[in-house]
Amino acid sequence: KNKDDDALPQLNVLFLVDQKSGLPIFYRFYDGNVPDVSTIRHTIADQALLNMKNVVLVAGKGYNSVKNINDCLINKVEFIFNVRLGTKGCLARELIDEHRKEFADLNSGDPYIRKNSATAKVNWKYDPRPVDGKPASNSATAELYCHMFYDPVIYQEAADKLTESLLTIKKKLLENEALTEQEEELKEKFFRNDKEKGLIIINRRVDDYLKYKGFRVLVTDSEKDPVKAWTAYADRWRVEDAFATLKDRLGCNRIRCSDNKALQGKTFVQFIATGLSLMVRSRIRCYMKENKKAGKLNLVYESDAKILQVLNNVMQTRFNHGYYFDEVAGKKI
């Protein structure tokens, strides 16, 4: 099944939009089973054929492989990749551990993105002319920026969810109730029988499980500012989220398309609609940068729905020869 839970092969859509203006530039279909390395290489080739300049590839955790980073460096294509944190001993975890004290400092928090952040520079080695079947020479180097972000709210939500699950399991075991398959897995991972205390939760394993919750690491070769890197990645997520929302609202699911031409047509409509959504966000961002005087509308980097909810209170009165805006009412965010 695909991400829509349909019994159909996965289809992916690659979007390229102008971050500053939100204008849509380019999109294409490709099969969901295409390896991430191939996707990145084809994207680099596409932007070269279209003679596009100042392109920055922004991608999620599925595209942060060493090969993809090397391909971008070799082809001089700038990138911002989200890094996986699930592997023990990985570089991202090591960097987080080195900077934990900084995340505990309230001064590391940014009021715009509402996250604590820290940045580390990494000297990255790669082969500028790789040859299949031969060991990498790693003769070239590049300076990468690893921007780390911590959200205590996400951490607390994960901790509360796990605590609730473990206490429910313990209650069921004490009352000899049957456990679900998922609860059995949690039991094997977080519980043990103590000779004196009986059934207990292994706190060390809970701490290990929660150790990197709430963290995100973005690696980039070009963006030194952590807030700008976060904003660029958040825009990528906004595009994906807006596309998924519009797919449902516009009836663009494949089960509602009569043939491939109808699917392609509806996808084009979504492409334009998603671009409009990003254009609204881009204009709001311009307002935030240019209007920092007291008394101006104070916006943080929230979802489209929350921002539009605030703007929904702005009323306009029209006359034959003009118009004016009424008083702005409502809670500022």
What residue spans do the PLM features occupy?
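Anion-binding and metal-coordination hotspots
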Residues: 1-333
